[in-house]
From Swiss-Prot:
Alphabetized InterPro entries for the sequence: Ribosomal_bL36, Ribosomal_bL36_sp, Ribosomal_L36_bact
Annotated organism of origin: Rickettsia massiliae (strain Mtu5)
Gene Ontology terms: biological process: translation
Protein name (Swiss-Prot/TrEMBL): Large ribosomal subunit protein bL36
Residue ranges of coiled coil: none
One Pfam family named in its UniProt record: Ribosomal_L36
Family: Belongs to the bacterial ribosomal protein bL36 family.
Matches recorded under PANTHER family: 50S RIBOSOMAL PROTEIN L36 2, LARGE RIBOSOMAL SUBUNIT PROTEIN BL36B
GO molecular function: structural constituent of ribosome
Amino acid sequence: MKVVSSLKSLKKRDKDCQIVQRRGKIFVINKKNKRFKAKQG
């Protein structure tokens, strides 16, 4: 999982990427291609 300061560019890496908020942190998840996971922090 990548940790980045801005998720905007990582959301555009794949059309199935979506942004979710869990436990106060913001994540990019992709259910079809798991290697596109990222966390903002």
